[in-house]
Amino acid sequence: MLIILKENIRTLGKLGEVVKVKPGYARNFLFPQRKAVKATKENLTKLEEQRLLLEEENIKRLNVAKELALSLHDKFVVLIKQASEDGKIFGSVTTREIAKILLQEGHVIDHRSLSFGGVSIKNLGEYQVNVELHSEVVVPITIYVVKSETDANELRQVKLQNQKSEQQEAEQDANKEATDGDDS
């Protein structure tokens, strides 16, 4: 099925391009999300008329995504899962679980924008998850899968202390550069 993209989609193409996709993908995802329309002469002329508006809208979404990316920078999520003695969890970690935790922390993120990079999380440990906020903005966040609440609390305390010390070092470096600049 030929469609016209109404926004940049990393895997398909740029705004306004005519691309061929499977009918189910278009019907079930692209059309309902208003990311594309069917490629007809009517829609092509409409799109040309609306191109500037769509580009402005895309720039606004990009700016919102960049702001959200700043709030997710250095973000980590701790998941508590039941596991066997050798560290295998019962079941696996899903994108919905991560999206739910992020929502509880005030970040509204669709679970479909989360990607494990083709890896299935079935063991305790540390994992990298990519959050695609926009076709041009992908933010990595760290997922820690632990066995108990005490492990989770210890990990959170250690991570928060590390972030505070890094922040203090950055402030000291900035102050040092400011005072060095004043001496010249």
UniProtKB/Swiss-Prot annotation:
Renumbered to this chain, region (Disordered) spans 160-184
Task: Report the domain of life of the source organism.
Answer: Bacteria
Instruction: Give the Gene3D superfamilies listed for this entry.
Output: Ribosomal protein L9, C-terminal domain (3.10.430.100), Ribosomal protein L9, N-terminal domain (3.40.5.10)
Q: Name one GO biological process term.
A: translation
Q: Looking at the keywords, is Ribonucleoprotein present?
A: yes
What family is this? Belongs to the bacterial ribosomal protein bL9 family.
Spell out the protein name for this chain.
Large ribosomal subunit protein bL9
